Amino acid sequence: MERLSMRIPENAAVILKGLSEAGYEAYVVGGCVRDSLLGREPKDWDITTSARPEQVKAVFAHTIDTGIEHGTVTVMIGKEGYEVTTYRIDGEYEDSRHPKEVQFTSQLLEDLKRRDFTINAMAYNPDRGIVDAFDGIGDLERKIIRCVGVPQERFDEDALRIMRAVRFSAQLGFEIDGPTKEAITEKVQQLENISAERIQMELVKILVSDHPEYMRLACDLGITAVVLPEYDRIRGVSQHTPNHIYDVEEHTLRAMMNIVPDKVLRLTMLMHDFGKPDVKKVVEDGREIFYKHPEVSAAYAEKIMRRLKFDNDTRTKVVRLVKWHGLKYDASEVSVRRALNRVGQDIFEDFIKVQHADIEAKNPAVIPGKLALLAEKEKTYHKVIAEGQCFTVRQLAIGGLDLIRAGIEPGPLLGAVLDKLTEAVIDDQRMNNKEKLLELAEKLKDDPAVFTPKEDFFM
């Protein structure tokens, strides 16, 4: 037992003291101990105790049965809730996810034995110090992710621990130790038994960590082959073009590192070039081109995010950003207005961040020029918005009702005419006048070309 001291929240200390005075053992446990020893601010303070759930409820006035069948009761101190879980031994696991039964125990060591990694298997009590039976402190000092006990047994109990190993490695910048790595490659196929929602959560935690480039490690260990096979397809795909010196995987990893740790933005950079293997072509001078790869990548993003059960808002934003990330436009007001019309004002600033990160992962020789141009585009964007310039159908001086009154029937033609009017105003803001727009609409309604959209160009 290490006689190190830790600062714990006052309310957590109240719970430890209350259980102790009632005759029970109680410790803060797991991630909060790990983070405190690393000098990080813990997000949650979990408590483990020798008291059974009904005994915990008898000690405290306000409790919630959050997972009582697994021994967990939430103790409310004011408006703050703390999960208090009885020492337990998990029974046999039948599906790499859930134990058949949970058996309570009076021994803290038995509870710590069932935890995933040594750095998460430490407990602390102000009176007793730190309980570190598996050298978690040593592994923190060595910067090692190591399973408690036999790694294969830990992964058999819950296969998601395979992804958690990479996640903690990415969050902390730690190495995974040899036997744990070997067990991962041996047991990785068991991830097929894990729900899409749980896979999604761990994937996002890796991506928004300090080291999103550890996706390379996930691929090396065979994890992506099971949960994200689309990633494996970009490994080793060359990009012989003046804009690139890295293969698609290396470019992708660098692009993720170049953007803020935001879920939508990191997911966008992860998948922005997933379509490149499908469209790669070698032209006469030996250059490799990837025509319309953003559209193909967007289709992959849609499929992947549905498979992993992402929420609709996140999925829609990511797919749109992936689709438009390669849009070609210049710094003129007309070009920026057209880009705003295509991309959407709601995600345009994220779109600029995506293009910035993409550029910074290209050939260093082209980066300064491309960043300078992007800065000009961003400057123009702010001017267009500040001046209230028109770039959407909603900003037109006329609406659908005006066109119906002018004799255009509701239906596809009406929508096509409105789109063409919007394009006309994007090209020339002086056209945003009711009389001029009605005059143009009269010409457009009989023009077969009204249904032909303006072509967009992609990098």
Across the structure, where does each feature detected by a protein language model lie?
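Catalytic cores of the polymerase beta-like nucleotidyltransferase superfamily
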Residues: 1-459
